[in-house]
UniProtKB/Swiss-Prot annotation:
MF annotations from Gene Ontology: hydrolase activity; metal ion binding; nucleotide binding
Biological source species: Acinetobacter phage SH-Ab 15497
Protein name listed in UniProt: dATP triphosphohydrolase
Residues binding Co(2+) 1: H31, H73, D74, D130
Pfam families per UniProt: YfbR-like
Lineage: superkingdom: Viruses
Similarity annotation: Belongs to the Caudovirales dATP triphosphohydrolase family.
SUPFAM superfamilies documented for this protein: HD-domain/PDEase-like (SSF109604)
Described purpose of this protein according to its UniProt entry: Catalyzes the hydrolysis of dATP, dADP and dAMP into dA. This step is essential for Z-genome synthesis (containing aminoadenine instead of adenine). Specifically removes dATP and its precursor dADP from the nucleotide pool of the host, preventing the incorporation of A into the phage genome and favoring the integration of the Z-base into the viral genome.
Length: 203
């Protein structure tokens, strides 16, 4: 197989992620949608802090690139399934190009065009949203008992998120990346959920 067809892509709604989360199974499609939802908020927030001269259409183009890249970023999992991060690291310790990388490249040319060949800024923003969504999902549905495996993974991802934000601040200083911290705090706060009564009554 050298290209995914539409049936393969639609299977993303049935391929499960997160082997460590037992309370609610999350499909690749659910994760993809959630990352795109985060990007819909994150990109405008980042743009609002942009200090360099901005070309016409820059915000729309960046948002489009991020949304498209996010669509493809985990699509190879419809073929490979969920591979635990330690296993991925073990495989990739073998060299620059591994069988896993080769398989992902064969999945679909669009995967290469829209994600792996995306601009560094686009990839950085997608990774930011990806980490934020993972922290959110584990916070909502993971085992919150101290030192449980899920709890340790969540804290590890949270640390990776903060490290990524630090690196983004150094590599793309025209943006104020602290807005990502604020958005993540909002995502983790149940009180931020909209109450239907407040909509109906105009509160």
């Amino acid at each position: 197989m050298d290209k995914l067809n539409i049936r393969d892509i639609l299977r993303a709604q049935d391929v499960t992620r997160w082997q460590i989360v037992r309370t609610k199974k999350q499909s690749v499609a659910e994760h993809t949608f959630a990352v795109q939802a985060v990007l819909m908020r994150l990109v405008p927030l980042l743009i609002s802090t942009y200090t360099a001269p901005m070309k016409v259409g820059f915000e729309e183009r960046l948002l489009c690139e991020c949304i498209m890249g996010a669509f493809w970023h985990d699509i190879p999992e419809v073929i490979t399934g969920d591979i635990a991060s330690p296993v991925k690291r073990l495989i990739r310790d073998g060299g620059d190009i591994t069988p896993l990388d080769d398989l992902e490249k064969k999945v679909d040319p669009a995967f290469i065009k829209c994600y792996t060949a995306a601009k560094p800024l686009t990839l950085a923003i997608i990774k930011c949203a990806d980490l934020m969504e993972m922290v959110y999902h584990l916070n909502e549905y993971g085992d919150q008992r101290a030192n449980s495996h899920s709890w340790r993974v969540q804290h590890g991802i949270n640390n990776a998120f903060h490290e990524h934000i630090h690196n983004c601040s150094e590599n793309f200083p025209a943006f104020k990346w602290d807005v990502a911290h604020g958005l993540l705090i909002e995502m983790l706060d149940p009180s931020q959920e909209t109450d239907i009564d407040s909509i109906v009554n105009g509160i």
